[in-house]
Amino acid sequence: MKLAVYSTKQYDKKYLQQVNESFGFELEFFDFLLTEKTAKTANGCEAVCIFVNDDGSRPVLEELKKHGVKYIALRCAGFNNVDLDAAKELGLKVVRVPAYDPEAVAEHAIGMMMTLNRRIHRAYQRTRDANFSLEGLTGFTMYGKPAGVIGTGKIGVAMLHILKGFGMRLLAFDPYPSAAALELGVEYVDLPTLFSESDVISLHCPLTPENYHLLNEAAFDQMKNGVMIVNTSRGALIDSQAAIEALKNQKIGSLGMDVYENERDLFFEDKSNDVIQDDVFRRLSACHNVLFTGHQAFLTAEALTSISQTTLQNLSNLEKGETCPNELV
């Protein structure tokens, strides 16, 4: 099978090539996004491999179909960028990687949490300038504090495991409670309760039409003053404009974002010599209590190996006509 891989970075290429030694696919790597204009580059390929910011809308899928593509392989868990109804109508099979390394994402979320709480990012900049003042660096002891986790799939449960180690009170919301989470002593509550009682809120749910801008002005109004929010899931779970207002009135005490709702034109590229045109992003990133990372929570050697293994195994199953547990349509 010939496979076109889009949005490729060197780390993608390295691990896919390593894993492919046991599959023998013909891999063609492209560093640009899959769009309606670039879909023609998949000509002659039975499958395409895409990432979070690639375009899987109906026009793109129709173009891929014209060029002989049969399979769409997402090398990520989220699939909100793919029109599944259109894929089904066109007879395209879509597969994903539902859980590559839950601990990797959870550990990154914890890293953001600790950095924001203890102002490590600010202390780092100060000490580089020989400023060893501790003013403005006071954090809070996490032990005993209530932490709310929204979404208790594998990543959410991994997050709860770590938070339990901190001795925090564990609150969670998920329409489908997890037995693994309950074994940790998690208290499932509704969203208003989670919002009003949590000192720290961490997002670990997929993006769906129903939870678009889950954290909006109304949600922020229900939260404690000075709440910490960390999002390593999907950017559009947070209304960025509403977050700016909540930061201004100090409803949000600190905000960690590994994802951003308009990240498609920013993340995964070096923009250090560009003038960022996204005014909302610029306002957020200018806040000392906002920490951005560029969608890197997944980026560990173990996760990249797992992603590559699952992606190629998914395609192998489809090619052989075998059942694929990660098939979406």
Task: For each feature predicted by the language model, list its residue ranges.
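Glycine-rich nucleotide-phosphate-binding loops and adjacent flexible coil segments
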Residues: 230
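An N-terminal-biased, well-structured beta-alpha scaffold segment characteristic
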Residues: 1-95, 216
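Rossmann-like dinucleotide/phosphate-binding beta-alpha-beta segment
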Residues: 135-225
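Short glycine-/small-residue-rich Rossmann-like dinucleotide-binding loops
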Residues: 52-53, 199, 205-207, 233-234, ...
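Rossmann-like dinucleotide-binding domain for NAD(H)/NADP(H)
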Residues: 226, 235-329
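A short helix->loop->beta-strand "cap" motif at the edges of active sites that frequently abuts
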Residues: 66-71, 90-92, 168, 225-227, ...
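Phosphate-binding beta-alpha-beta segment of Rossmann-like dinucleotide-binding domains, i.e.
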Residues: 90-92, 98-146, 158-161, 165
